């Protein structure tokens, strides 16, 4: 099996797990946050910087790479790892979420999805087979199944038809993937916010005995309380001996809550996207560095942070860079936000190990401002 999880400890007061994710490109401590490198790059970061920040696995995007530069070119380069000079693990999402976000620009059939490229308006087609073949060409360690990402809100009938199609498509992905010695296919549980539909979806996809499972269709606009409720009844339906991945979640509160419900893996564009907007994550909540109050503040973003940015630069200097549209500003903010989250995950793992996760959550939430 190309990818497996070794569960080292289960928390006795929550559903949290401490583990090691074994992949063809290294062993990653879990729970883990995966930075997003949509177009074969985590925006503004070099692979060496990502390693220094503590990232062992990153996410890349099938939809974007399929459109540009094209998967055949990446195959020619020796795969995504060689192409982008990254020797850690890579998870590629299937492109399903991006295609379904196109709204009126796409047409869903049983065969797949016809859509217009956001780059040049040309007609394209993605199916379970094509999405899997593209990911085989990319050579990622973890291949996500091509699923129908159900929007929120969705009617019960739509959610049921959608999850059943996702199961049929998953079987087609499984039949297409011939590189199981070095690539692991993860199935995705759908079912919107309906408990019985989530149960149906989980039962159907776990029957296929895949190397890992993801919870999809969350973090799509629903209230966080509802997302936690769905996780409460969905995660226990997934096998304990397989990795569990919550797609598209990366805010500090949701990472902690997700871990407490038994999730091992997370990804989100949040830290990199808000960095480019001039917003930093800190222990005491979000800090909008571009705001006027940072103009004469010569302290670091977060004095407790060990990242390159906090060790060397002031809020005033960072604000100047951001206001002047200097690229260094985006880089330094991104370095900090990614380090903040890899550090958060490291603290979460330590808290699980030392049986103090609920206490850690309470202290973190209080300091961050979630409880005020």
Swiss-Prot record:
**Which protein, by its recorded name, is this?**
Queuine tRNA-ribosyltransferase
> Region entry RNA binding: which residue ranges?
248-254, 272-276
Q: Give me the comment on cofactor binding.
A: Binds 1 zinc ion per subunit.
Organism from which the protein derives: Desulfitobacterium hafniense (strain DSM 10664 / DCB-2)
| Stored InterPro entries | ArchSynthase1/Queuine_TRR, TGT, TGT-like_sf, tRNA_ribo_trans-like
Q: For this protein, what reaction is catalysed?
A: 7-aminomethyl-7-carbaguanine + guanosine(34) in tRNA = 7-aminomethyl-7-carbaguanosine(34) in tRNA + guanine
Annotated binding of Zn(2+), by residue = 305, 307, 310, 336
Q: Catalytic site residues?
A: 93, 267
Q: What is its EC number?
A: 2.4.2.29
Q: Which HAMAP family match?
A: Q_tRNA_Tgt
Matches recorded under Gene3D superfamilies:
Queuine tRNA-ribosyltransferase-like (3.20.20.105)
Q: Output a single Gene Ontology CC term carried by this record.
A: cytosol
- An annotated GO BP: queuosine biosynthetic process
């Amino acid at each position: 099996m190309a990818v497996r999880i070794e569960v080292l400890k289960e928390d006795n007061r929550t559903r949290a797990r401490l583990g090691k994710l074994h992949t063809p490109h290294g062993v990653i401590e879990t729970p883990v946050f995966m930075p997003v490198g949509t177009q074969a790059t985590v925006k503004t970061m070099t692979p060496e910087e990502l390693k220094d920040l503590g990232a062992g696995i990153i996410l890349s995007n099938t939809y974007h790479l399929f459109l540009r530069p094209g998967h055949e070119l990446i195959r020619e380069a020796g795969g995504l790892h060689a192409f982008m000079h990254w020797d850690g693990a890579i998870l590629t999402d299937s492109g399903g979420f991006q295609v379904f976000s196109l709204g009126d620009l796409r047409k869903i059939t049983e065969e797949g999805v016809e859509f217009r490229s956001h780059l040049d308006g040309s007609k394209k087609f993605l199916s379970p087979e094509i999405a899997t073949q593209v990911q085989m060409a990319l050579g990622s360690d973890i291949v996500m199944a091509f699923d129908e990402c159900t929007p929120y809100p969705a009617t019960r009938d739509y959610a049921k038809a959608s999850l059943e199609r996702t199961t049929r498509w998953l079987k087609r992905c499984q039949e297409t993937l011939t590189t199981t010695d070095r690539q692991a296919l993860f199935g995705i549980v759908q079912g919107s916010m309906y408990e019985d539909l989530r149960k149906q979806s989980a039962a159907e996809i776990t029957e296929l005995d895949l190397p890992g499972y993801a919870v999809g269709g969350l973090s799509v606009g629903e209230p966080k309380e509802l997302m936690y409720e769905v996780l409460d009844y969905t995660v226990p339906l997934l096998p304990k001996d397989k990795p569990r991945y919550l797609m598209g979640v990366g805010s500090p509160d949701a990472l902690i809550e997700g871990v407490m419900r038994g999730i091992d893996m997370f990804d989100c564009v949040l830290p990199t996207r808000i960095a480019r907007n001039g917003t930093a994550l800190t222990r005491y909540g979000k800090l909008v560095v571009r705001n006027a109050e940072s103009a004469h503040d010569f302290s670091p973003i977060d004095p407790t942070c060990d990242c390159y940015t906090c060790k060397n630069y002031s809020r005033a200097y960072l604000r100047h860079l951001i206001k002047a549209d200097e690229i260094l500003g985006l880089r330094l903010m991104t370095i900090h936000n990614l380090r903040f989250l890899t550090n958060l995950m490291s603290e979460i793992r330590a808290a699980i190990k030392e049986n103090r996760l609920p206490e850690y959550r309470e202290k973190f939430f209080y300091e961050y401002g979630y409880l005020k």
